[in-house]
Amino acid sequence: MQVLVRDNNVDQALKALKKKMQREGIFREMKLRRHFEKPSERKAREAAEAVRRARKLERKRLEREGF
């Protein structure tokens, strides 16, 4: 991953790097890989995430339709 440093502005480059890493999901992946996760735990976590995503999409859809 690359970030351009313009006018020796390292703070701005760091901010851009963090934003890119956040979008790519690197921080989330690092957090998940700190400890081994059993395959059964992974399946349960992914299923729970899918349920949360579905509920969120349904809420957004209802909000758009005005219900």
Swiss-Prot record:
Record the organism. Answer: Granulibacter bethesdensis (strain ATCC BAA-1260 / CGDNIH1)
Tell me what this protein is called: Small ribosomal subunit protein bS21
Q: What GO cellular-component annotations does this UniProt entry give?
A: ribonucleoprotein complex; ribosome
* Highest taxon of the lineage: Bacteria
Reply yes or no: does the keyword Ribonucleoprotein apply: yes
Query: Which HAMAP family does the protein's record reference?
Result: Ribosomal_bS21
Keywords, A to Z?
A: Ribonucleoprotein, Ribosomal protein
GO biological process assignments = translation
The family this protein is said to belong to: Belongs to the bacterial ribosomal protein bS21 family.
Return the PROSITE patterns for the record: RIBOSOMAL_S21
GO molecular-function terms, A-Z? structural constituent of ribosome
**Which InterPro entries does this chain map to?**
Ribosomal_bS21, Ribosomal_bS21_CS, Ribosomal_bS21_sf
